[in-house]
Amino acid sequence: MKRLIVGISGASGAIYGVRLLQVLRDVADVETHLVMSQAARQTLSLETDFSLREVRASADVTHDARDIAASISSGSFQTLGMVILPCSIKTLSGIVHSYTDGLLTRAADVVLKERRPLVLCVRETPLHLGHLRLMTQAAEIGAVIMPPVPAFYHRPQSLDDVINQTVNRVLDQFAITLPEDLFARWQGA
């Protein structure tokens, strides 16, 4: 069984993380480990109709963001890596500066030190120079910066289409193949 850590921070776009968990429920060989910041809980209630209970039920394992002794806080716990979707600037800053004040940033720090993939879906705009420098520093220490920027070549017809394309592309970063792609991939002109 492959394990993927899914982090949801307080940035706008909680629906991306929720959809990722929903999609991974149908992937038999991937076990999801969810950690949500306190701010993520608030964003979830402000932006979606999903309850915290529903989101937790979508994950195979849920970790309390305050539990720094959780399995995902150790490098000996084998995982494919971690995605933080969405990733707030606060979370990005904590990761870059190794400020592991909770499980979300601790798990990310562990993934980096173990040289496993860490995908940060930074959800902020516009960006000032400090934000850009943080993203550069994160990339320099091994993270993949992957803002949830929609593509339009697949001609999305709904918000779900836009979300699905991003979720599918995030899973590509971990070489997780879905039974069926969530969007039409570019085949050339």
Model segments located where?
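A cross-family phosphate/adenosyl-ligand binding-site feature
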Residues: M1-V119, R123-A189
